[in-house]
């Protein structure tokens, strides 16, 4: 499990120091989440959803096009050993489904369409052995990721 968590966090990048002002970092840490990235325009944290699933939430700060960011994040995750399965969307966000056959885990990359706070885009990666295929399952993944991200905005 530790190897899976480490792999997910490494996919997200390097750690720096200067969180965006509208993110409640104290509450994130108080709730037992792990800060992954802390920069002036990107902040990310990770948490265990259950014994076999990890959620990493990232806030991108700035005036970015959500659809372009969605494709950009998806393409960044497509490395050797990761297969693109498909994508979908709901009113709340976009989701890209990827699979790592060697590890037997799925990655669901979620990007919120709407911003609770202007110029704060919520994205998330859910890593799980569970395959979610139905529209209602994918909508639940999108909702989980966005709700978790919005919970820590001031």
Residue ranges of model-derived segments:
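Cleaved targeting-peptide boundary
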Residues: 18-26
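Surface-exposed amphipathic alpha-helical segments
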Residues: 26-34, 124-154
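Short, solvent-exposed coil/turn segments at beta-strand boundaries
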Residues: 29-31, 48-52, 90-93, 112-121
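Signature of long, low-cysteine stretches enriched in small and polar/charged residues
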Residues: 78-117
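Short, exposed beta-strand-loop hairpins at the edges of beta-sheets
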Residues: 99-101, 112-119, 125-137
